[in-house]
């Protein structure tokens, strides 16, 4: 049987369900596929096939994730759903499932619970741009005032973590009803269809990598006699053209130079684009002025920093991580893009130690500056062995 052709003409958006255990994330995920399939065709997924998500290894971390897809008028959605709370934590911190927006599922019968809060906090820390809310199990609540109260609580919680709680769309309904193809008082299929409309309206289309300012992590440096210095790497975003000025950022003082040529597979090109492995010839740059771990970037678009707040997941013993906890003053290496830099960890007040398998907010001070911005992912390593994964939540200096 021939594979169905992937529709390129619709914008592609990555989303995921977040929220407290048993509030209906997986049921809603299944309902979304059903409601969308009935309008736009495509397959709909049964609850069980999503709930028994296969485990994947992402950078040595075991994460169980279900991937489903569905469509709306304008868009093609790729949606991730995780069976367990720990899987969410790992997924969001490693960026294994990059989300352009999240669907927060909250039971109208229970209101916000501890993981509701934790997932909103995580979304803030890892830079999920937007949240749309589905108040689930509304068919179990007879009291209109109670629904309004829960909605108010959710909005306050979003505001608390710097999301625009007053403007976030909140759709009220029953995922189970929609999954069973029912629609009493518009709470089933209609509510889920409205949720899809809210995703369309409220989650902005992400800027494609090619349209962002140029950045290339430097992997290798060569000196070619008579030509100068060539740096190689994979262009992370943007385009670099021959003749353009770039900055070399990180590890040392920022330096400006000009790209006098771009090569790929030993052929000269006019430009290097996001996703391509290229060599860039730099004018007047000595072999010793550049090193692996720095980045080549469009001038003024990224700056070097040494102190930042991060959200870190510490690998469990089973994942090949540490067997023992660590304490404040812990000094591992932080692997950014292509290189390790040693740094010291400061733990939040009241946190004395961090156990393998935990996630923790920490402030890190590096011994050398790295080109960084909020949302940058890194690995925590000890002598080349990965013991954690993290994301820059906020740059301090």
From Swiss-Prot:
Annotated region (G4), positions in chain: 136-139
Annotated keywords: Cytoplasm, Elongation factor, GTP-binding, Hydrolase, Magnesium, Metal-binding, Nucleotide-binding, Protein biosynthesis
Top-level EC class: hydrolase
GO molecular function: GTP binding; GTPase activity; guanosine tetraphosphate binding; translation elongation factor activity
Cellular component GO terms, alphabetical: cytosol
Annotated segments matching region G2: 60-64
Family matches, as Pfam families: GTP_EFTU, GTP_EFTU_D2, GTP_EFTU_D3
Residues that coordinate or bind Mg(2+): 26
Residues the entry annotates as binding GTP: 19-26, 81-85, 136-139
Principal cellular location given in the protein's record: cytoplasm
Record's subcellular location: Cytoplasm
InterPro entries: EF-Tu_GTP-bd, EF-Tu_GTPase, EFTu-like_2, EFTU_2, G_TR_CS, P-loop_NTPase, Small_GTP-bd, T_Tr_GTP-bd_dom
Annotated stretches, region: G1: 19-26
Location of the region described as G5 in the Swiss-Prot/TrEMBL record: 174-176
Xref: Gene3D superfamilies: P-loop containing nucleotide triphosphate hydrolases (3.40.50.300), Translation factors (2.40.30.10)
Catalysed reaction equations from the record: GTP + H2O = GDP + phosphate + H(+)
Enzyme Commission number(s): 3.6.5.3
Region (G3): 81-84
Highest taxon of source: Bacteria
Complex and partners: Monomer.
Cited function: GTP hydrolase that promotes the GTP-dependent binding of aminoacyl-tRNA to the A-site of ribosomes during protein biosynthesis.
Stated family: Belongs to the TRAFAC class translation factor GTPase superfamily. Classic translation factor GTPase family. EF-Tu/EF-1A subfamily.
Protein name in the entry: Elongation factor Tu
């Amino acid at each position: 049987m021939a594979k169905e052709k992937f529709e390129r003409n619709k914008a592609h958006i990555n989303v995921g369900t977040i929220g407290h255990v048993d509030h209906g994330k997986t049921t809603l995920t299944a309902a979304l596929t059903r409601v969308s399939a009935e309008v736009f065709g495509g397959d709909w997924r049964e609850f069980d096939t999503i709930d028994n998500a296969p485990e994947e290894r992402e950078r040595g971390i075991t994460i169980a994730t279900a991937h489903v897809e569905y469509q709306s008028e304008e868009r093609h959605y790729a949606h991730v759903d995780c069976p367990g709370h720990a899987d969410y934590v790992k997924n969001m911190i490693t960026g294994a499932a990059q989300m352009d927006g999240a669907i927060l599922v909250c039971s109208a019968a229970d209101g916000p619970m501890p993981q509701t809060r934790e997932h909103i906090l995580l979304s803030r820390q890892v830079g999920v741009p937007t949240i749309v809310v589905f108040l689930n199990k509304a068919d179990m609540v007879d009291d209109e005032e109670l629904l309004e109260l829960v909605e108010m609580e959710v909005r306050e919680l979003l505001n608390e973590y710097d999301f625009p709680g007053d403007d976030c769309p909140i759709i009220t309904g029953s995922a189970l009803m929609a999954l069973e193809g029912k629609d009493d008082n518009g709470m089933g299929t209609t509510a889920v269809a409205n949720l899809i409309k809210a995703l369309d309206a409220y989650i902005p289309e992400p800027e494609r990598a090619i349209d962002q300012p140029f950045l290339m992590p430097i992997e290798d440096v060569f000196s070619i006699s008579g030509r100068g210095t060539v740096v190689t790497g994979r262009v992370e975003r943007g385009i670099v053209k021959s003749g353009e000025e770039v900055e070399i950022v990180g590890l040392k003082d920022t330096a400006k130079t000009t790209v006098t040529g771009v090569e790929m597979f030993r052929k000269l090109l006019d430009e290097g684009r996001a996703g391509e492995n290229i060599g860039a010839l730099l004018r007047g740059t000595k072999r010793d002025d550049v090193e692996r771990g720095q980045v080549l970037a469009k001038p003024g678009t990224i700056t070097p920093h040494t102190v930042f707040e991060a959200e870190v997941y510490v690998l469990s013993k089973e994942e090949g991580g540490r067997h023992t906890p660590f304490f404040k003053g812990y000094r591992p290496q932080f692997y950014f893009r292509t290189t390790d830099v040693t740094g010291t960890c400061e733990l939040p007040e009241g946190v004395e130690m961090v156990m393998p398998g935990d996630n923790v907010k920490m402030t890190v001070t590096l011994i050398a500056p790295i080109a960084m911005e909020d949302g940058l992912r890194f690995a925590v390593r000890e002598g080349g062995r990965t013991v954690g994964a993290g994301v820059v939540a906020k740059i301090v200096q």
